[in-house]
């Protein structure tokens, strides 16, 4: 936009409207500037004003003309068609975009040396550490997980911090920015804060040293009584009802509400936290915590927990995924693989992909929703072997088996082996069905990438070899920026099915005692997978009926679930 100086006539109109300036020569305006829409305004420093020629919607169907009324501005740029009114203190050192509505606020200010929460180093998972996660606008769950997991690697840690700092220094604005279409009303204090396009701040108590991202299709809402300090808020997030966020990264489309207090934590992708608190917590994608008593501290949470239930909360059960604890009198019993055939798991498998509310433009964190993958199947293989070893050591006729101080009934142990085996058959059939779509001959993989251990890097399922390669490539300069690292994550995710086939092919041969995989073998494996899938859905149906009898679900929900199970013919994840 080009600006010009005020004319004498415009200055006279402004003065008649009770406006004044330290120096009218420092007030610059657009070519079509209209002074009639400014009243009771005081200007200090360098001022740049856009057009005021349109109405702006301040509430649904309630339009007011753009302009500036009852405000003090110092070193401020105001875009076209903004309405700024009732600024009780002042606006200082800010650039305000087009079509913004700012009303009934106290202070909006940028002070010297601020970084808007970017570059802040926090301690996640380990509160005693010197800090392991660098807050930056590019942060996603994978990058944060890498920082936490390898925080002991000084070379990697320093390299990542330097990358983040270089990027921040390049992009950091000299003063605060309010994006286009932003609405700020009934808010006390906003200092050293960037507000992205189409954000709304309504009734907040304080925003300080914070970057709030936002776009037209993923705007951010910050509501009543919210305090947010030294943090970064991603596209589509919402902070509501007296939430307190300090030294945090809040990811895409996350909701923090109802007095939830978060400190020194990272929260990613579709998480919903209400009433409780988080401290030095790594809340991966789809972390849900809605209890007033919930305390997320020094741990990693997220979608993976929803699939594994009690296992991740009990160290004695970590090697037996999908298991459950029950008590009878003073005895605690372990029921292996119990959760694998529950309606709760079935709901989770189908629910989470549908609940990803992120628009494509705001999907930074990668989330692989496969509940059966090389990562989880490897755990299942080991768990099945543990149960078989217990049976072999104590004998098939033993009434009970002991595992890390927990008792496993004989029937539960046998059922656990069957459930784990059922999952393995479902998985193998699903992989073959997918591969047949583009490789009907089921050719043996020609690469080793995908062999060995796998990891879940906060939603990204990948071979450990690829994860270690990322670490080495960061340290030797092959990956020379945060953007390059993020692109590598995307590339690995895109290769998931190929890596999965490399891992699964030898597993299938070993499981079925084959030397090669023929079309006839594939038909046999898919047939067994379909039978296993039917057994699985029958078990889930029985569990749903139990929930209905206990009053946990109503009859309509039960019928809907049965209808869904009746159409379960696809054995793919």
Residue spans for each PLM region:
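Long, compositionally biased intrinsically disordered regions
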Residues: 327-573
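Glycine-rich hexapeptide-repeat left-handed beta-helix
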Residues: 9-52, 56-68, 77, 85-172, ...
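Core alpha-helical transmembrane segments of integral membrane proteins
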Residues: 178-182, 186-203, 209-212, 217
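Long, structured ligand/cofactor-binding scaffold of large enzymes
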Residues: 70, 79, 170, 176, ...
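Intrinsically disordered, low-structural-confidence terminal and linker regions
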Residues: 1-8
């Amino acid at each position: 936009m080009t600006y010009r100086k005020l004319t004498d006539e415009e200055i006279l109109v402004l003065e008649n409207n009770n406006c004044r300036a330290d120096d009218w020569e420092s007030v610059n305006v657009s070519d079509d500037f209209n002074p009639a829409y400014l009243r009771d305004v005081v200007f200090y420093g360098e001022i740049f004003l856009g057009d005021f020629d349109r109405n702006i919607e301040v509430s649904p169907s309630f339009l007011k003309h753009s302009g500036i009324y009852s405000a003090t501005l110092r070193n401020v740029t105001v875009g076209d068609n903004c309405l700024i009114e009732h600024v009780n203190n002042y606006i200082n050192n800010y650039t305000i975009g087009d079509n913004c509505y700012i009303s009934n606020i106290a202070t909006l200010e940028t002070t010297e040396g601020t970084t808007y929460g970017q570059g802040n180093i926090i301690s996640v998972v380990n509160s005693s550490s010197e800090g392991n996660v660098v807050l930056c606008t590019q942060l996603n769950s994978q990058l944060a997980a890498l920082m936490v997991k390898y925080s002991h690697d000084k070379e990697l840690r320093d390299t990542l911090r330097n990358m983040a700092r270089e990027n921040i220094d390049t992009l950091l604005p000299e003063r605060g920015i309010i994006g286009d279409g932003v609405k700020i009303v009934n808010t006390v204090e906003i200092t050293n804060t960037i507000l992205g396009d189409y954000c709304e701040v309504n009734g907040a108590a304080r925003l300080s040293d914070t970057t709030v991202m936002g776009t037209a299709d993923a705007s951010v809402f910050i509501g009543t009584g919210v305090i947010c300090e030294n943090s970064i808020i991603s596209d589509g997030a919402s902070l509501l009802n007296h939430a307190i966020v300090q030294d945090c990264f809040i990811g895409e489309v996350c909701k923090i509400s109802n007095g939830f207090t978060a400190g020194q934590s990272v929260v990613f992708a579709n998480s919903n936290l209400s009433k409780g608190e988080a401290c030095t917590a790594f809340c991966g994608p789809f972390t849900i915590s809605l209890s007033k008593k919930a305390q997320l501290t020094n741990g990693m949470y997220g979608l993976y927990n929803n699939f594994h239930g009690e296992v991740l909360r009990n160290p004695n059960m970590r090697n037996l995924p999908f298991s459950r604890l029950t008590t009878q009198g003073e005895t605690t019993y372990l029921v292996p693989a119990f959760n694998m055939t529950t309606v709760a798991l079935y709901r989770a498998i189908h629910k989470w992909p549908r609940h990803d509310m992120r628009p494509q433009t705001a999907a930074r964190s990668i989330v692989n929703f496969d509940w059966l993958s090389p990562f989880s199947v490897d755990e299942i293989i080991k768990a099945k072997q543990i149960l078989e070893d217990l049976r072999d050591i104590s004998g098939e006729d033993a009434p009970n088996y002991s595992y890390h101080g927990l008792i496993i009934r004989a029937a539960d142990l046998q059922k656990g082996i069957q459930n784990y085996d059922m999952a393995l058959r479902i998985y193998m059939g699903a992989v073959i069905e997918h591969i047949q779509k583009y490789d009907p001959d089921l050719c043996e993989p020609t690469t080793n990438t995908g062999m060995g251990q796998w990891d879940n890097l906060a939603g990204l399922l990948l071979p450990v070899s690829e994860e270690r390669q990322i670490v080495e490539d960061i340290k030797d300069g092959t990956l020379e920026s945060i953007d390059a690292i993020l692109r590598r994550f995307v590339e690995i995710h895109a290769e998931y099915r190929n890596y999965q086939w490399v891992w699964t092919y030898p597993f299938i041969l070993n499981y079925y005692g084959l030397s090669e995989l023929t079309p006839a073998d594939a038909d046999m494996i898919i047939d067994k997978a379909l039978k296993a899938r039917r057994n699985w859905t029958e078990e889930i149906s029985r569990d749903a009926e139990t929930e209905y009898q206990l009053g946990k679900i109503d009859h309509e929900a039960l019928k809907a679930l049965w209808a869904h199970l009746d159409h379960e013919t696809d054995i793919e994840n």
